[in-house]
């Protein structure tokens, strides 16, 4: 009888320890995810400011191995590809400003998270040029959270 009580006590203690560990990981994961969300919001807040100035440092918001996967175009990868994307959008696309709205951020905040959202882009006269949705895979790097894979699609019907 003593052995079975001892065994039950050990099982109960192991279970309590397991639950406590799981809760600790959940709390830590939430803190990491919140950290990622704050970094993403900060990056999003300055993206179009840099773009509006045609500032090449916009590439620093992206991981060195980032890819922008625009619709109907090959992926543009690396900082050189990201720079080309923004240069072309500014010089030939007529885009002068934009706005993003984050709908959700998914993940545990440890290495990668995914941002889901909506975008709008405007010309120099503040006329809406395009609007759509996006998914961005963010990567935690030694320099903080960086845009790693950026994919978007227009809500407008292609002509």
Enumerate the predicted regions with their spans:
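Residue-level signal for glycine
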Residues: 126-128
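Surface-exposed, charged secondary-structure patches
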Residues: 85-124
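Short beta-strand edge/turn micro-motifs at domain boundaries
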Residues: 131-156
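Hydrophobic pocket/interface hotspot
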Residues: 47, 58-59, 66, 78, ...
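Bacterial Sec-dependent N-terminal signal peptides
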Residues: 1-27
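A short gly/proline-enriched turn/hairpin at secondary-structure junctions
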Residues: 61, 67-77, 88-95
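Short, low-complexity N-terminal intrinsically disordered segments enriched in polar/charged residues
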Residues: 20-61, 159
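Sec/Tat-exported extracytoplasmic proteins
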Residues: 44-47, 51-55, 65-66, 86-93, ...
């Amino acid at each position: 009888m003593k052995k079975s009580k001892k065994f039950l006590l050990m099982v109960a203690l192991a279970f309590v320890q397991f639950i406590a560990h799981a809760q600790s990981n959940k709390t830590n994961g939430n803190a990491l995810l919140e950290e990622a969300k704050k970094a993403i919001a900060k990056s999003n807040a300055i993206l179009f400011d840099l773009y509006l100035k045609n500032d090449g440092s916009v590439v620093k918001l992206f991981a060195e191995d980032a890819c922008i996967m625009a619709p109907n175009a090959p992926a543009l990868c690396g900082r050189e590809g990201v720079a080309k994307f923004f240069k072309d959008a500014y010089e030939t696309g007529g885009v002068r400003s934009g706005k993003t709205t984050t709908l959700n951020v998914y993940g545990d905040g440890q290495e990668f998270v995914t941002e889901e959202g909506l975008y709008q882009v405007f010309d120099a006269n503040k006329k809406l040029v395009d609007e759509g949705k996006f998914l961005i895979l963010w990567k935690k790097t030694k320099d903080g959270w960086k845009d790693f894979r950026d994919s978007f699609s227009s809500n407008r019907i292609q002509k």
